[in-house]
Amino acid sequence: IYFPPISTEILQEQLQKSGADPVQALVMARISGGNVRLSRELMQNSNDLMEKLYLLLNACFSSDPTIWNKCIDTIARLKTKDINQMEQLFRCVVLFFRDLLYYSAAKTDEEIIFKNQLNKIDKLSKIYSDADWHACIEHIENTQNYISRNGYLPLQMICMILDIQKSLKGEIYEPFQLRDWTPV
């Protein structure tokens, strides 16, 4: 038996009935992808999740190492506290970059998840018109994978930030492969 995902409108309505802010409820309903349990869990942690999301996004678009260190420290504490919340955070970052990819290609906000950040999405897509948003998403997903496999978190995060910043400039970047070290 297959149960399809619940519509965003129904989830948003349920979250609003439980006392959630309409804009925040819409964002959490869209992030959850039709999963009722996840939407409620995200709503309970929404302020904390959004604060950490903005910190991580700020690090991705900043060249200030103090912001990077604050982000790395936050992610490291989150990993030791609850790895599931860390993975939710990375999923949210991927969704934000997906919104940037979608908006820069389609120039419409119909399918944007982070509607509450539409001005920022518009501004970033104009500032980084040459950005390779898809490569940014790959960098984030790879970093999440490496950290989940016990990669050294500070190194992985710094590499991700630097790789994203190269992709934002539209620089062609080829990821390092292990075979690059082996003699031919």
Summary of predicted features, one role per range:
Residues V94-R98, Y102:
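Amphipathic alpha-helical core segments of compact helical bundles
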Residues I1-C92, A106-V184:
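Charged, glycine-rich active-site and insertion segments that engage polyanionic ligands
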